């Protein structure tokens, strides 16, 4: 199997532990190294490669290819998305299944009042052991369909520590369907959650099970 945008090995860990024939591609060399350290007790942990998912070439085909946790949404324009999907197709055979996991855009999320910050998570800092709170603000461009997000990190006394900025392309189901069909994929299933319930108007997720 092949995971694209494999990150720090969050999904790879259980797959490799259970003996899967796993390969991961990750753009960040730092994330790839963290994944290898996490998985170094397993013989196939070195199959995590640094590469660009828009232009990779592995000279083999896989039974299963997947991209999880909204990573597809970091492809911010049609050229990047088309290049990615073209690369995926070159690594598929007639029985390959390709899984894409993204969230369904929510207008309440996209069109927040400017400057509003919404709590998204809390975690314990590994060094200071203090609780760090993260709040999110965003600005959505309806023409480009790109959502620019800022995460604001606060300590437990509400002092701002730092911010992180990132952008995500928003795909509504109709646009996603058209993109996949135009790129030559068969949509076998569209699920709205991890329990494989059919995608509907209230689904928070879009999970696509695809073939050639």
Predicted features along the sequence, with ranges:
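SAM-dependent methyltransferase
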Residues: 99-177
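A short acidic, Gly/Pro-enriched loop at the edge of an enzyme's catalytic core
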Residues: 57-64
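A short His-aromatic
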Residues: 73-75
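C-terminal lobe and adjacent flexible extensions of AdoMet/dcAdoMet transferase-like proteins
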Residues: 167-212
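A conserved beta-strand element that flanks and buttresses the S-adenosyl-L-methionine
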Residues: 66-68
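Conserved class I S-adenosyl-L-methionine
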Residues: 1-5
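Class I SAM-dependent methyltransferase SAM/SAH-binding core
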Residues: 10-55
């Amino acid at each position: 199997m092949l995971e694209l945008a494999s990150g720090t090995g969050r999904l790879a860990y259980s797959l490799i532990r259970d003996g899967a024939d796993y390969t991961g591609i990750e753009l960040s060399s730092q994330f790839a190294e963290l994944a290898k350290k996490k998985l170094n007790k397993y013989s196939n942990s070195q199959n995590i490669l640094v590469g660009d998912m828009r232009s990779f070439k592995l000279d083999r085909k896989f039974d299963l290819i997947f991209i999880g946790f909204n990573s597809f949404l970091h492809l911010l324009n049609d050229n990047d998305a088309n290049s990615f999907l073209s690369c995926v197709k070159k690594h598929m055979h007639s029985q390959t299944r390709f899984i894409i996991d993204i969230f369904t855009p929510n207008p309440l999320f996209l069109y927040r009042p400017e400057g509003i910050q919404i709590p998204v998570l809390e975690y314990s800092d590994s060094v200071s052991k203090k609780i760090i709170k993260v709040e999110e603000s965003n600005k959505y461009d309806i023409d480009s369909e790109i959502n620019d997000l800022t995460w604001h990190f606060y300590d437990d006394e509400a002092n701002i520590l730092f911010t992180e900025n990132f952008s995500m392309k928003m795909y509504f189901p109709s646009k996603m369907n058209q993109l996949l069909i135009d790129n030559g994929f068969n949509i076998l299933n569209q699920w709205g959650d991890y329990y494989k319930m059919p995608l509907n108007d209230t689904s928070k997720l879009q999970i696509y099970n695809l073939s050639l």
